[in-house]
A protein has these predicted regions:
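Extended catalytic cores of very large enzyme megasubunits
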Residues: 1-176
Length: 176
C-alpha cells in the first residue's frame, strides 16, 4: 500500500469552497463577547484523605459552566505543566487552540468559499464549544494545536483481511 499526497481539492481563494451559514452567532460580534466570564479556582482533593491532589487558581470560564465541567477541562485538557508560565489558564485558550488550528487548515486547503465563510466557521465552532452544544473527543483536546503531529481519533483500527491467518493475527495484535 502506498500513500499518495494529493493537492487540496480546491485551491484556496477560488470561491469554490464551502459556504457557511450563521446559526448561533452574529456578524461582527465574537462569541466570547456574548457571555460573562469569571475567574475561579479548580481544586481536586482525595475523597478519603482530603489531601489536595490538583490546584490551579484563577482559571477563566463562562459563569454558566459547572464546577464539574471546569474541573474536567482544567485538569485534563489545559496544555502546559502545572505552575509553568506557558500553562493554559482559560477556556478561551483551549477552544482557540483547537478551533483556530482547524480554521487555518481549512483556509490553507481551500475549504471555504470566502474569508467570511472561514470566520463564520470559526465563530460557530467557538460558540458551540463554549455553550457545550458539542465537544470533541479527548485526543482532539490533547493534541490539536500542538507542534508535533498527533493522532486525533479515539481509537486505532487495525485492518483485517478476509483470511483465517489475518483474523487470528488481529486477535494477537489486539491482545485478546
Amino acid at each position: 500500500m502506498s500513500i499518495v499526497n494529493k493537492p487540496a481539492a480546491v485551491k484556496a481563494g477560488t470561491g469554490k469552497g464551502l459556504t457557511i451559514e450563521r446559526i448561533y452567532t452574529t456578524a461582527g460580534v465574537h462569541p466570547y463577547d456574548t457571555v460573562k466570564w469569571e475567574r475561579r479556582d479548580v481544586v481536586q482533593t482525595n475523597w478519603k484523605s482530603g489531601e489536595v491532589i490538583f490546584e490551579q487558581k484563577g482559571v477563566e470560564y463562562p459563569e454558566f459552566w459547572s464546577v464539574n465541567a471546569s474541573t474536567i477541562v482544567t485538569t485534563k485538557y489545559f496544555r502546559g505543566a502545572l505552575g509553568a508560565e506557558n500553562r493554559e489558564w482559560s477556556l478561551k485558550q483551549v477552544i482557540d487552540r483547537v478551533v483556530l488550528t482547524y480554521t487555518k487548515a481549512g483556509k490553507e486547503h481551500g475549504y471555504f468559499a470566502t474569508p467570511a465563510d472561514a470566520e463564520i466557521f470559526e465563530h460557530e465552532l467557538t460558540h458551540m464549544l463554549m455553550h457545550q452544544i458539542f465537544s470533541y473527543n479527548s485526543p482532539v483536546w490533547f493534541n490539536v494545536g500542538t507542534n508535533a503531529p498527533q493522532q486525533v481519533s479515539a481509537c486505532f483500527i487495525l485492518s483485517v483481511d478476509d483470511t483465517m491467518e489475518s483474523i487470528l493475527n488481529w486477535y494477537k495484535e489486539e491482545g485478546f
